[in-house]
C-alpha cells in the first residue's frame, strides 16, 4: 500500500492513506503521502458508519477520484463513501476470508463489490470465481496483479557486515553455524509445527550442533499456539537450537544472514 502511495506521489498524483496506525507508518515519507488517522481497523458497525461519514469529507475536501480498500471493514466504509460521492472504487482481494455462514460471506462480499477487483494471485482469482460469482457482473473487472517487491531494498550487496553482526548478536546466534529461517506470523497454516518436526529430523542426520533454526514472526495474540510450539521444541530437545523472534525491522538483512529460508505453509498462499 505505501509503495503504491509513494509511486503515485512521484507521478504527481495526490496520495492519501487512511489508517488506524501500524509499524509501516514510520517508513512513509510524510512530505509525499498524507496520512489520515481513522479507526478503520474496527469491525463495529457503528464505527464503520462513522468512518463512512468521515471518508466522505476526506474525499470531497481532497478531491480524491479513486478509493482503494484492502480490508473488509474499511471496504464497507469506502464502498458507501465512493457511491455517495460518485468516485471509482477499487479493492485488492488478498485472502481467502473464511465464511461459515451466509452472514460472514455477505460481509466478505464487499471485496468484490468494487468497480475493479484486484486478485493478488491466480489462486485468489480462482477463489473469487468459485465462491463469489453471484456478486460479479459484466460491469465489474477482475484481474490478477501479482504483488511485487522492492528489489533495491532486498539487494543483499547493500548490507554491511557490521549490520549482520549486530543482528546476530540481537538473535544471540553465532555465525559459525548454519541458520535456517522460517519467516511469517505464528498461525497454524503457516506450518511452524511441520517446520519443527522437520528440524528434528535434520538434527538426527546432522547433529545438535550443526545449525540454528529461527522462527521469525509475531504470535499476534495467539499465545496458546506459541506455547504449543515451544512445548514441541522441548519435546524434541530443540530449545537451544530453535529461536523464536517476534519482529525484525530489516527483513532483507534477516534473509542475508540466513543460509536457508523456508516456506512451510500447509495451505495456498494468497500472494
Q: Which functions belong to the PLM regions below?
A:
Residues 69-75, 93:
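Short His-centered aromatic/hydrophobic patch
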Residues 114-144, 149-154:
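A short, active-site helix/loop in glycosyltransferases that binds the activated sugar's phosphate group
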Residues 221-226, 238-248, 254:
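Active-site donor-binding acidic/aromatic loop of nucleotide-activated sugar
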Residues 17-23, 149, 183, 212-227:
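Glycosyltransferase donor-sugar binding loop
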Residues 5-46, 129, 134-141, 221:
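N-terminal strand-loop element at the rim of the active site
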Residues 83, 89-122, 126, 136:
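A conserved, positively charged/aromatic
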Residues 133, 155-173, 228-230:
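A short helix/loop element that forms part of the nucleotide-sugar donor recognition site in Leloir-type
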Residues 2-3, 178-204, 227, 269:
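A conserved mid-protein helix/loop that constitutes part of the nucleotide-sugar donor-binding site
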Amino acid at each position: 500500500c505505501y509503495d503504491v502511495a509513494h509511486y503515485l506521489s512521484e507521478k504527481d498524483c495526490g496520495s492519501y492513506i487512511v489508517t488506524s496506525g501500524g509499524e509501516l507508518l514510520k517508513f512513509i515519507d510524510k512530505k509525499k503521502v498524507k496520512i489520515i488517522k481513522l479507526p478503520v481497523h474496527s469491525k463495529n458497525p457503528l464505527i464503520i458508519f462513522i468512518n463512512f461519514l468521515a471518508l466522505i469529507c476526506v474525499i470531497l475536501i481532497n478531491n480524491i477520484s479513486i478509493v482503494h480498500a484492502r480490508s473488509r471493514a474499511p471496504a464497507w466504509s469506502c464502498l458507501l463513501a465512493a457511491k455517495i460521492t460518485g468516485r471509482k472504487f477499487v479493492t485488492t482481494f488478498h485472502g481467502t476470508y473464511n465464511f461459515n455462514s451466509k452472514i460472514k460471506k455477505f460481509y466478505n462480499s464487499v471485496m468484490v463489490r468494487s468497480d475493479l477487483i484486484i486478485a493478488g494471485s491466480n489462486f485468489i482469482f480462482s477463489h473469487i470465481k468459485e465462491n463469489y460469482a453471484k456478486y460479479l457482473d459484466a460491469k465489474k473487472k477482475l484481474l490478477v496483479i501479482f504483488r511485487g517487491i522492492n528489489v533495491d531494498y532486498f539487494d543483499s550487496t547493500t548490507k554491511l557486515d557490521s549490520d549482520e553482526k549486530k543482528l546476530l548478536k540481537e538473535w544471540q546466534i553465532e555465525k559459525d553455524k548454519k541458520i535456517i529461517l522460517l519467516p511469517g506470523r505464528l498461525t497454524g497454516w503457516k506450518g511452524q509445527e511441520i517446520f519443527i518436526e522437520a528440524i528434528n529430523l535434520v538434527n538426527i542426520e546432522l547433529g545438535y550442533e550443526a545449525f540454528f533454526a529461527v522462527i521469525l514472526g509475531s504470535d499476534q495474540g495467539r499465545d496458546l499456539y506459541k506455547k504449543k510450539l515451544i512445548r514441541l521444541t522441548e519435546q524434541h530437545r530443540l530449545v537451544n537450537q530453535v529461536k523464536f523472534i517476534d519482529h525484525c525491522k530489516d527483513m532483507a538483512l534477516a534473509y542475508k544472514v540466513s543460509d536457508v529460508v523456508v516456506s512451510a505453509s500447509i495451505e495456498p498462499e494468497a500472494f
